[in-house]
Amino acid sequence: MRRGLLQQVRRVVIKVGSRVLTVEGGGLDYDAISRLCDEMAGLRQQGIEVILVSSGAVAAGRDALRSADTTLTIPQKQAAAAVGQPLLMQAYQQACTRHGLVTAQILLTAEDLANRNRFLNARTTLEALLTAGALPVINENDSVAVAEIKFGDNDNLSALVTSLAEADLLLILTDIEGLYSANPASDPDAELIPLVRSITREIERMAGGSGSNVGTGGMATKVTAAKKAARFGVPTILAPGKQPGVITAAVSGQEIGTLFLPATDGLNRRKHWIAYTLRPAGKVLVDAGAQKALVEKGTSLLPSGITGVEGRFERGRCVRICGPDGTEIARGLADYSSSEIQLIAGHKSAEIEQLLGYRYGDDVVHRDNLVLMTHS
């Protein structure tokens, strides 16, 4: 199955975690970086374009600053990232030079991709770099990003970059073999799961929520990233980054790590951007009838089915649409502001102009701007 699925891969996003890139003491593992660059250069020689999403800046900076703190404050992390990012890029460039590869640094915040124009500009830049034969190395701009504009972790960032770059495969390299049925560190009966056809609640339970003091992501964030990529129609492989030949083996379809299959109901580019790149500014609460119409019939959200609104937001912002029990069922771009929705909630569309004195349309969220999240 793997070879058949991956034989058409021509562009891959590779995410490398901090534990893969650092030695036990916390500094950069230059041998590991050199090996990974050798393998990425090998893909380039096969005509496969590579985009690298790399962690490790904070860890490199902390080591350079000789910080003994296991837990850093946000300002300390930002300072460590500022010191570590050029060290990380220098390591990649030195390792790529012997292959004639030029590396290109791209630092992003969630705010960059939430703005549609900047999202498209970032895509254009990526295309230009790949056309020129460069290796884009992407990281979150930790030195300036605060909670409101952070991706959260590079696993999430790698899934968004997969959509941004319209890649054919997401390869996440971590410090364990793949997804296990239980935590292999504490359960001797834990078994490696080689194939995940669909990311169910049971799969999410297996992923747990563990992380480390080196990176910010645990297995749960990797499964979430695989889910986001799957809805874009892209498979994800979770594989052991310290294993020599891992990139070559994974991309060529060998049995390594865990393969997450793409979803059968993949989203188009714009809807994927709405669902996973935009940060919801509020909630719109709906009744059971509206929920059924959205989920079963794929309709737009009308004011008559709205029971309430939470948060303050302007027209055009992304909102969560939640059912009677509070569960998120969809996300979409609101055609009315929160204050306007409060006034028209529960009323028929024909009454909007009478209530507001104007109307933008019959829908609060049009179906073209609405994405069901029931599979997410």
Swiss-Prot record:
List each copy of the PUA domain by range: 281-359
Q: Which reaction does it catalyse?
A: L-glutamate + ATP = L-glutamyl 5-phosphate + ADP
The entry's localization annotation reads: Cytoplasm
Keyword annotations from UniProtKB, A to Z: Amino-acid biosynthesis, ATP-binding, Cytoplasm, Kinase, Nucleotide-binding, Proline biosynthesis, Transferase
Per UniProt, the enzyme's principal EC class comes to transferase
| Pathway(s) where this gene product acts | Amino-acid biosynthesis; L-proline biosynthesis; L-glutamate 5-semialdehyde from L-glutamate: step 1/2
GO terms, biological process: L-proline biosynthetic process
Residues that coordinate or bind substrate: S55, D142, N154
User: Is Cytoplasm included in the keywords of this UniProt record?
Assistant: yes
Which of this chain's residues are annotated to bind ATP? Answer: K15, T174, D175, T216, G217, G218, M219, A220, T221, K222
- What GO CC terms are in its UniProt record? cytosol
Keyword Calcium recorded: no
Q: What is its EC number?
A: 2.7.2.11
Q: Which GO terms describe its molecular function?
A: ATP binding; glutamate 5-kinase activity; RNA binding
Q: Which family does it belong to?
A: Belongs to the glutamate 5-kinase family.
Q: Which PANTHER family match?
A: GLUTAMATE 5-KINASE (PTHR43654), ISOPENTENYL PHOSPHATE KINASE (PTHR43654:SF1)
Q: Which NCBIfam families match?
A: proB (TIGR01027)
Q: What does this protein do?
A: Catalyzes the transfer of a phosphate group to glutamate to form L-glutamate 5-phosphate.
Q: What is this protein called?
A: Glutamate 5-kinase
Give the source species.
Trichlorobacter lovleyi (strain ATCC BAA-1151 / DSM 17278 / SZ)
Q: List the lineage, top down.
A: Bacteria, Pseudomonadati, Thermodesulfobacteriota, Desulfuromonadia, Geobacterales
Gene behind this protein: proB
